[in-house]
Amino acid sequence: MIQFCTMKFYDRKYELDKLKEIYDLSAEFSHMVVITGRRRIGKTELIVKFAQKKDDIVYFFVSKKKPIVLLQEYRDILSLKIPFLKNTAFITFEDFFNFLFSYMKENRLIIIFDEFQNFESVEPSVFSVLQNYWDSKKNDIKGAFIFIGSVFSSMQRIFAGENEPLAGRTTAKLYIEPLKPSALVEMLEDYNVKTPSNLLFYYSLFGGVPKYYFLLDRYKLFPKSKAEVIKKLFCERNAPLQNEGREIFIEEFGKNYGVYFSILQSIASGNTQMVRIADYCGININSIGKYLEELTSLYKIIERKLPVTEYKVEAKIGRYRIIDNAVSFWFRYIYKNQSLIEIGEEKILLDKIYADLNTFMGFKFEELIKSILIEKNSDVGNNPLPFQFTKIGGFWTKKENIEIDIVAYNEEEKKIIFGECKLNGNGFNSIDVKKFKEKASFVEWERNIRAEYFALFSLVDVKEEIKRKLEKEKIKVYSLRNLL
């Protein structure tokens, strides 16, 4: 039985259902499963939940130790289920896998390797050994091999790289995404801190990454002030997240980490276009594309966004954003101000953060609203919008400098909704209404036949009087509280 000290387990129904399906099938057929996702996303906790009340699951962690030490540890773990192994020694991984595949001919086992990519430095021959046994014996055994990894580029190379021993052999892959907004709302309810302001604050700092909420729980920070949360987790000397970016990425990036860190700091600081990123970093515009492509496709740390109605993938109007909110926060505020922490000037750093926090949270509010709308879109009875959309995103133009926070549309029904996001929608006046509708006219999509809708999304509740005025202008008002 795998046991870890955990807080309440949230969400992950899809992933658990998928693992249960594989578990049931493994009674007759063997499976090879790969689970990836960024560090802290909850991959191990998912396996812990999946393993509950199952006595045929064996969990191995791939520590960076000498192979013989790992083999001794693995023998000891296996002997808890197979007692006669106590007096057996595995000298090589060939011995180890030979035993597993022989035993699994008659006995189902679910073998889990966590941080599987570490074998690249511990014992690279494992991949070829495993390939040989899998190719020759997979039809003779019952059970599954589940490989978990946090270094996405390494896991991608091991299981999809050209000429790699294990390439093309998986029967299932799971990429673990952040928790959905509804799970965060449930969490805040459990800790009696459910307010729109708190949801936006925690989402802005941590997104849907479970480990950060675990830290809030362990440090009893849920009921504390925003300043106390930031100070305790980021700004104090030896704070648990003071070196978060380094801990997550230096192994992934290797010796070129300085270039990647500069690019991530640039994007986090608001430079989202290729030219501005290159200027900020002092990198030639002809060279920056390589690094941006690697951060996008190989490492999956950033993404390139286009206006939602743009179909040309190579359009020069693309913008880059850091996918993970905690990473974005760290590179925006902590990375470039590490010296303030080291000399004990945490108050200066906190003041800097607080002076800019509303701007940062304003960007994240747009992302939160989009996430909520996406989650509710398939729930016909609970969809707040007047139709179910097939595409959602933002819209902007370069020439006219037009920007609309949210545009969603249904390609078959020819319906489109334009949304503005405000931390305080009470200041949205008649001039704003006029500008809003003028901006919508720049969206060319199905201009002559589309049905148009308009929405204002506000963090705070909008006064009834203002709401009535806006709805007379055909602008539906949604407060975050009403969307939860």
Where are these regions (language model features)?
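Phosphate-binding site recognition
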Residues: 1-351
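A cross-kingdom feature that marks ATP-driven nucleic-acid transaction machinery
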Residues: 318-484
